[in-house]
Amino acid sequence: MKYRVRKLFSSLLLVSVLVLTILLGSDILNTATAAAAVRQLEEAPGQVVYQSRGTLKDQQGNRWGAIAFKRIRPDGKASFDLRLVGFPGMVEIDRTQPLLLTNSLGKTWKANDASTNIFTDEIQPHVGQYDLQPLVTQLQTAIPLTLTLATVNGEPVKLSIPPSLVQEWQTVANY
């Protein structure tokens, strides 16, 4: 009896380790790729910003800040942008190229650069901002996305966006 219990326990432990290894290897349990939270800020009287802030990893394992936000101005005009922030000195974004959003089915959208809206003094080469207003409603919340960010050195940065973050962006866009 003692031998059977030990053998059963060993088998269960082995199966558990194998399942955990498979899940970790396939990135299913990787919650660090996108942890986000929705925030509401009043920037000025009558001007409100809704934000989704997340942390993403590129294909090299470098962390990026992703801030999707809707700004509603006092006159009622609204915009919805995505700001991507890399580590200073690691990347120089090519602002002459659009941000490409590609879903796992191969559908691609282009988001135009809107970085001139964020820099008052000096352009930061590791920060880019893109206009998602025209396309955010077209993104499917059940399908993961890959963002492709052009760089000056020609090697694009690829960021994986889980469906939950796409859904959060759409929630923010609908405020």
Show where each model-derived region lies.
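Bacterial N-terminal signal peptides that target proteins for export
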Residues: K2-L18
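C-terminal segment of classical bacterial N-terminal signal peptides
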Residues: V19-T31
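Low-complexity, acidic Ser/Thr/Pro/Gly-rich terminal tails and inter-domain linkers that flank the onset
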Residues: A37-P74
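Extracytoplasmic
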Residues: Q51, K77-S79, D94-T96, A142-P144, ...
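Short, surface-exposed binding/anchoring microloops in extracellular/periplasmic proteins
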Residues: N62-L100
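Short, hydrophobic/aromatic beta-strand segments
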Residues: E92-P98, A111-N112, K158-S160
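Short, solvent-exposed, Trp/other aromatic-anchored flexible loops in extracytoplasmic proteins
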Residues: L105-G154
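Short beta-strand elements
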Residues: L159-Y175
